[in-house]
């Protein structure tokens, strides 16, 4: 049987709730095109790192991060209402670079395939 840490279960709940809060409660246009990709909660449940990407963008705009930080207090308050935890974790927002990295890898693989096709057609 697989053992799950409580922090992992809380992280899943926090991810779901923050995604819902961003979708339904935040009206700031700077954060309207965000997707929450992951949440890491510390073992003591006091800190949560929220990873996000901007739809259609390879990198995060500074205005987006600023908008999230401004809305952080409101998001934390909403989490406190929705989750039954003794402590609501402090929220740290971080852009998720894994999508940009994956996009770059995909681009390199496509370039290699194009070069192989060009080399094969020359002979």
From Swiss-Prot:
Compartments where located: Cytoplasm
UniProt-listed InterPro entries: KH_dom-like_a/b, RbfA, RbfA_dom_sf, Ribosome-bd_factorA_CS
Keyword Cytoplasm: yes
Any one of the GO CC terms: cytosol
Record-level GO BP terms: maturation of SSU-rRNA
Pfam families, A to Z: RBFA
PANTHER family with a match to the protein in the record: RIBOSOME-BINDING FACTOR A, CHLOROPLASTIC-RELATED
Record-stated family: Belongs to the RbfA family.
Subunit field text: Monomer. Binds 30S ribosomal subunits, but not 50S ribosomal subunits or 70S ribosomes.
Role summary: One of several proteins that assist in the late maturation steps of the functional core of the 30S ribosomal subunit. Associates with free 30S ribosomal subunits (but not with 30S subunits that are part of 70S ribosomes or polysomes). Required for efficient processing of 16S rRNA. May interact with the 5'-terminal helix region of 16S rRNA.
Protein name (database record): Ribosome-binding factor A
Species assigned in the record: Syntrophus aciditrophicus (strain SB)
